[in-house]
């Protein structure tokens, strides 16, 4: 019986060894699968990290593009407002230039009139009133006279027609205005024609 017990035990032992080998093989196989899964997992994580980095870069690029587009729209809006403002201010430029000879002629008529003649006096008063009203109306639209007599010569506002020696005036001073200049909303549309002291 002891032999039989030994035999059974040997058979059982063989069976246990066989099962242990199977378990070890299964464990090795499972370990290999786990390693493979771990490698796949690491590869997938690396792939996902790369995709995330790429997406973050794209988002940043898109945000930069949106900011640039907003800035461009703001600049365009500002330029358009400035152009509209400039167009409003200087829309009357050509019209104002055409009115200047009318003002000049009214002033010449006032200067040339004989103030002693009683017949002409009422006409002269009418011309003076017309001139004053006309100048006041165009001033409402930004047309302003440049009459620099006695001021320092400024080439931005004055056009020197002649330069003469004068003991009564400082050098580079406007002695005489031959024709008044005009500006429209701060922009010179006709410089004053002047005689300058040397």
UniProtKB/Swiss-Prot annotation:
InterPro entries xrefs: GrpE, GrpE_coiled_coil, GrpE_head
UniProt GO cellular component terms: cytosol
Family (UniProt): Belongs to the GrpE family.
Gene Ontology molecular function, alphabetical: adenyl-nucleotide exchange factor activity; protein homodimerization activity; protein-folding chaperone binding; unfolded protein binding
Keyword Signal among UniProt keywords: no
UniProt keyword list: Chaperone, Cytoplasm, Stress response
Species, as recorded: Vibrio parahaemolyticus serotype O3:K6 (strain RIMD 2210633)
CDD domains reported in the protein's UniProt record: GrpE
Assembly, per entry: Homodimer.
Top-level taxonomic group: Bacteria
Protein name (record): Protein GrpE
Pfam families: GrpE (PF01025)
Protein localization: Cytoplasm
Role played: Participates actively in the response to hyperosmotic and heat shock by preventing the aggregation of stress-denatured proteins, in association with DnaK and GrpE. It is the nucleotide exchange factor for DnaK and may function as a thermosensor. Unfolded proteins bind initially to DnaJ; upon interaction with the DnaJ-bound protein, DnaK hydrolyzes its bound ATP, resulting in the formation of a stable complex. GrpE releases ADP from DnaK; ATP binding to DnaK triggers the release of the substrate protein, thus completing the reaction cycle.
Gene3D superfamilies in UniProt: 3.90.20.20, Head domain of nucleotide exchange factor GrpE
PROSITE patterns: GRPE
GO biological process, alphabetically ordered: protein folding
Lineage: Bacteria, Pseudomonadati, Pseudomonadota, Gammaproteobacteria, Vibrionales
């Amino acid at each position: 019986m002891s032999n039989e017990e030994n035999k059974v035990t040997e058979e059982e032992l063989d069976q246990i060894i066989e099962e242990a080998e199977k378990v070890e093989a299964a464990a090795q196989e499972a370990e290999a699968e786990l390693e493979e899964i771990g490698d796949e997992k690491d590869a997938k994580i690396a792939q996902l990290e790369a995709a995330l980095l790429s997406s973050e870069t794209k988002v940043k690029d898109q945000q930069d593009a949106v900011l640039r587009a907003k800035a461009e729209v703001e600049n365009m809006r500002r330029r358009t407002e400035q152009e509209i403002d400039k167009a409003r201010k200087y829309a009357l430029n050509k019209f104002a230039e055409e009115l200047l000879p009318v003002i000049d002629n009214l002033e010449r008529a006032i200067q040339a009139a004989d103030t002693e003649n009683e017949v002409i006096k009422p006409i002269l008063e009418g011309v003076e009133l017309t001139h004053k009203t006309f100048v006041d109306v165009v001033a409402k639209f930004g047309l302003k006279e440049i009459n620099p007599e006695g001021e320092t010569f400024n080439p931005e506002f004055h056009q020197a027609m002649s330069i003469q020696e004068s003991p009564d005036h400082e050098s580079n001073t406007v002695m005489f205005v031959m024709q008044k200049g005009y500006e429209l909303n701060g922009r010179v549309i006709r410089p004053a024609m002047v005689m300058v002291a040397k």
